[in-house]
Curated annotation (Swiss-Prot):
Organism annotation: Pseudomonas aeruginosa (strain LESB58)
Pfam families in the cross-refs: DALR_1 (PF05746), tRNA_synt_2f (PF02092)
Family: Belongs to the class-II aminoacyl-tRNA synthetase family.
Subunit annotation: Tetramer of two alpha and two beta subunits.
Keywords linked to the UniProt accession: Aminoacyl-tRNA synthetase, ATP-binding, Cytoplasm, Ligase, Nucleotide-binding, Protein biosynthesis
GO MF annotation terms: arginine-tRNA ligase activity; ATP binding; glycine-tRNA ligase activity
Protein's recorded name: Glycine--tRNA ligase beta subunit
EC main group: ligase
PROSITE patterns: AA_TRNA_LIGASE_II_GLYAB
Lineage, uppermost ranks: Bacteria, Pseudomonadati, Pseudomonadota, Gammaproteobacteria, Pseudomonadales
Primary location recorded for the protein, binned into one broad class: cytoplasm
Single GO cellular component term: cytosol
GO terms, biological process: arginyl-tRNA aminoacylation; glycyl-tRNA aminoacylation
Enzyme Commission (EC) number: 6.1.1.14
Keyword Nucleotide-binding in annotation: yes
Length: 684
C-alpha cells in the first residue's frame, strides 16, 4: 500500500512557555492514538513546538485504510428454520438487519452468518477528524475564546497548515482553513512561509528564522550557554526547568552575556540567583569555587545588528531587582535575627495549633532532646530551634520566599551565631525533595527531624490526615525526610520516644490518646514504599515491621540483613520451618516453659537440635546486641539441617505432656533466636 508524509501545524499567539513541551507531546500522542484507531499505519511520528506553533510530522502514512471483513453471527440454524425448512422471523429479521436477501446469508455453520468486506477509507478524509480530536484532548486547564468565535483553545489560533504528501488537506479547524502557508519569525521574517512538503517543514522554517524543533533549540541553547560561560572563566547554572522554559520562549535563540555591578555580590548569592532565574529567566554564572560571578546570560529571540543594545537593556532591567534584594538584605541586618521572633507571635502556623512563634519554641525543645540522643550539641540545637523561623518575618523572605532558611543562615552568621547553629537554620528544611541534600551537621539534623515531627504530631493531633492525593501539609514528605535523615546519616534515634516527647509538648492542643501510635504507624509505613522503590520485597519489610523496631536506623539494618539472608540457599527452608513453628506454638493449649529441659530430650534429632540451638543462641545473642544482624542470620542459617531432621524424625504433639511441652520450649527457643532479627516466617 502506498504511503505519504503528513504534516499538521497549528499557528497561534504565544503559547504558555511552561506548558509548551507537554502540549507538543500530547498533540503527538493524540494523533498517534487516532491513527492507530483508524488502522492507518505509519513509519514514524514526531512533534515540533515553538512559541507560536504546534506541529506533528508523520512519516510514510498509509494513504488508505486496509479493507476489512466484518462477520455478523445470527440465530442458530434450528431457530432460523422451522421443521419444514421455512425461514422463521428470526432468520428474516437477521437478513433485514444485514440489509441483504436471506439467500446471501451463510448457512453452513451452526449459526447464520453474514460476511461483508468493507473498503478502507482514504486517509485524507480521516485526518481532519483525528487532528481535531487530538487538539480537543490537549491538557489545557482553561481554554479561551477570541473575537466573536465560539471555538476555544489555549490561545487564539492564527493559521493552519495541513499537508498530505504534496497536497493540502481541505478542512477548517479552530476557525482556521487549512493551507500550506505558515509564518516566519515575527521580526526577521514576518511574511507567510510556503511549506513545500512535510519533509521540508523544518528547513522551510529555518530559512524564515524559526527553529521549530523544541529539542534542537534546547540543545543549541545549552551548548551556547556553556560556551559563553567558559569564555567568562565560569560555569552556568542551567536548571532543566529553566532551560525548558527559555526554549519555549524563543524561536531563534541568541544567547548573550550581560553583567551587573560587583557591589551586589555582597547580597546572598541565592537571592540574586533566585531573582535572575525566576523573574528574568537568566542563566547565572559561577566561578570555580561556586561563587556567583557578576555576569549572566540572557537568550534573545532576535539576531540583532546591535546586540549591545539588547545587553544594556537586560542590564537595566535586572538592576532594580538586584537593588531591591540589596535593600532588603541591609534592612534585615539592622536588627538581631532573634528580634524577628516577636513578629511571629502574630503569624498563624495552624489555627488550632497556634502561632509560628509557638512552633519555634516546640522545635527548640524537641531539637535539644534529639541532639542529646544522636551525639549532638543540645544547647546549639535548642538555640537553632529558637531562631529556626525568624527569617520568615524578614523583608528578604517576604520578597523571596525561596530564601527561607538560606536568609536565616546569612543573618545568623552576621549575628555571630555558632556555625552549626547558622547552618541548621537552612538545613531544617532538608531534604527539600526526593533524593535532595541532607543536613551536614548534627544540629541541622536534630532541628530538621524536630520540625518535621512537630508538624506530623500537630496535624495528626487535630485529625487532618492526608487522604489520597491531598496532603496540604506535606506530611508524607515530612515522614520520608525524617527517615532519610536518620537512616542515611546513620543516626540511631528511638523514634517512639521522640514522637511521645513531641506529643507532650503540644499539651491540650491535640488529642493525645493513641496519637503517638498513629504518627509512628504513618512514618514507618512510608518505609514500605521506600523499600519497594529500592527493589526490596514487601515480605522483607513485613518481617521486620512485625517486631516494631523503634529506631529507623535499626529497622533498616534489619531489612538489609534479611535481604542478604534471602539469598542464602538455606533461607527458603528455614522460613518455611519458622512458619510451621509459629503455627504449632499458636495452636498450643499448653503453657510453653521458658527453658528447655535437656533430660526430657528423648530423640536423637531433638537432642541435636537442642544442642545446635543452644550453641547458636550463645553466638547470635552478642551479634544481635551489636546489631550485626547479617552475621546473626548467617550463623542461624546453619540450623537448617538439624531443623529439617527434627521435623522429619520427631513428633511434637506426643501424648506425654512433659515431653510435648519441652518440645514446644525447644521450638520457642529456635523461633526466638530468629526473632532477635526478624520474623522470617513471613518470608514464605
Amino acid at each position: 500500500m502506498s504511503a505519504k508524509d503528513f504534516l499538521v501545524e497549528l499557528g497561534t499567539e504565544e503559547l504558555p512557555p511552561k506548558a509548551l513541551n507537554s502540549l507538543g507531546e500530547a498533540f503527538l500522542s493524540g494523533i498517534e492514538k487516532g491513527l492507530k484507531a483508524a488502522g492507518l499505519s505509519y513509519a514514524a511520528a514526531r512533534f515540533y513546538a515553538a512559541p507560536r506553533r504546534l506541529a506533528v510530522l508523520v512519516e510514510q502514512l498509509a494513504v488508505q485504510q486496509p479493507d476489512r471483513t466484518v462477520n455478523l453471527d445470527g440465530p442458530p440454524l434450528q431457530a432460523a428454520f422451522d421443521a419444514s425448512g421455512n425461514p422463521t422471523q428470526a432468520a428474516l429479521g437477521f437478513a433485514k438487519k444485514c440489509g441483504v436477501d436471506l439467500q446471501q446469508i451463510d448457512k453452513s455453520g451452526p449459526k447464520l452468518r453474514f460476511s461483508q468486506t468493507i473498503a478502507g477509507q482514504p486517509a485524507a478524509g480521516l485526518l481532519p477528524g483525528i487532528v481535531e480530536a487530538s487538539l480537543n484532548e490537549l491538557p489545557i486547564p482553561k481554554r479561551m475564546r477570541w473575537a466573536a468565535r465560539r471555538e476555544e483553545f489555549v490561545r487564539p489560533t492564527q493559521w493552519l497548515v495541513m499537508l498530505f504528501g504534496d497536497d493540502v488537506v481541505e478542512c477548517e479547524i479552530l476557525a482556521q482553513k487549512a493551507g500550506r502557508e505558515s509564518r516566519g519569525h515575527r521580526f526577521h521574517n514576518p511574511d507567510n512561509v510556503r511549506i513545500s512538503s512535510p519533509a521540508a517543514y523544518l528547513e522551510d522554517l529555518r530559512g524564515a528564522h524559526v527553529l521549530a524543533d523544541f529539542a534542537e533549540r534546547r540543545e543549541l541553547i545549552a551548548k551556547r550557554v556553556a560556551e559563553l560561560a567558559a569564555e567568562q572563566q565560569g560555569s552556568a547554572i542551567v536548571p532543566p526547568s529553566l532551560l525548558d522554559e527559555v526554549t519555549a520562549l524563543v524561536e531563534w535563540p541568541v544567547p548573550l552575556v550581560c553583567s551587573f555591578e560587583e557591589r551586589f555580590l555582597e547580597v546572598p548569592q541565592e537571592a540574586l540567583i533566585t531573582t535572575m532565574q525566576d523573574n528574568q529567566k537568566y542563566f547565572c554564572l559561577l566561578d570555580a569555587n561556586g561563587k556567583l560571578l557578576p555576569r549572566f546570560i540572557t537568550v534573545a529571540n532576535v539576531e540583532s545588528k546591535a546586540p549591545e543594545n539588547i545587553v544594556s537593556g537586560n542590564e537595566k532591567v535586572v538592576r532594580p531587582r538586584l537593588t531591591d534584594a540589596e535593600f532588603f538584605f541591609k534592612q534585615d541586618k539592622k536588627q538581631p535575627l532573634e528580634s524577628f521572633n516577636e513578629r511571629l507571635r502574630n503569624v498563624v502556623f495552624q489555627a488550632q495549633l497556634g502561632t509560628v512563634f509557638e512552633k519555634a519554641q516546640r522545635v527548640s525543645g524537641l531539637a535539644a532532646y534529639i541532639a542529646e540522643r544522636i551525639g549532638g550539641n543540645a544547647q546549639n540545637a535548642s538555640r537553632a530551634g529558637i531562631l529556626s523561623k525568624c527569617d520568615l518575618a524578614t523583608e528578604m523572605v517576604g520578597e523571596f520566599p525561596e530564601m527561607q532558611g538560606i536568609a536565616g543562615y546569612y543573618y545568623a552568621t552576621h549575628g555571630g551565631e555558632a556555625e552549626d547553629v547558622a547552618l541548621a537554620l537552612n538545613e531544617q528544611y532538608m531534604p527539600r525533595g526526593a533524593g535532595a541534600e541532607l543536613p551536614s551537621t548534627l544540629t541541622g539534623a536534630a532541628v530538621a527531624v524536630a520540625d518535621k515531627l512537630d508538624t506530623l504530631v500537630g496535624i495528626f493531633g487535630i485529625g487532618m490526615l492526608p487522604t489520597g492525593s491531598k496532603d496540604p501539609y506535606a506530611l508524607r514528605r515530612a515522614a520520608l525526610g525524617v527517615l532519610r535523615i536518620l537512616i542515611e546519616k546513620q543516626l540511631d534515634l528511638d523514634l517512639v520516644a521522640a514522637v511521645n516527647a513531641a506529643v507532650e509538648q503540644y499539651g491540650d492542643k491535640v488529642k493525645a490518646a493513641g496519637l503517638a501510635e498513629q504518627v509512628l504507624d504513618f512514618v514507618f509505613d512510608r518505609l514500605r514504599a521506600r523499600y519497594e522503590d529500592e527493589g526490596v520485597d514487601v515480605a522483607v519489610y513485613q518481617s521486620v515491621r512485625a517486631l516494631k523496631p523503634s529506631s529507623p536506623l535499626d529497622f533498616d539494618q534489619r531489612v538489609q540483613a534479611v535481604q542478604a539472608f534471602r539469598q542464602l540457599p538455606e533461607a527458603e527452608a528455614l522460613a518455611a520451618a519458622n512458619k510451621r513453628v509459629s503455627n504449632i506454638l499458636a495452636k498450643s493449649e499448653d503453657e510453653v516453659p521458658p527453658n528447655v529441659d535437656a533430660s526430657l530430650l528423648v530423640e536423637a534429632a531433638e537432642k541435636a537440635l537442642g544442642s545446635a540451638v543452644a550453641n547458636a543462641e550463645s553466638e547470635v545473642a552478642p551479634l544481635a546486641a551489636a546489631r550485626d544482624y547479617r552475621a546473626a542470620l548467617a550463623r542461624l542459617a546453619a540450623l537448617r539441617e538439624p531443623v529439617d531432621t527434627f521435623f522429619a524424625d520427631v513428633m511434637v504433639n506426643v501424648d506425654d505432656a512433659a515431653v510435648r511441652a519441652n518440645r514446644y520450649a525447644l521450638l520457642a527457643k529456635l523461633r526466638g533466636s530468629f526473632l532477635g532479627v526478624a520474623d522470617i516466617s513471613l518470608l514464605g
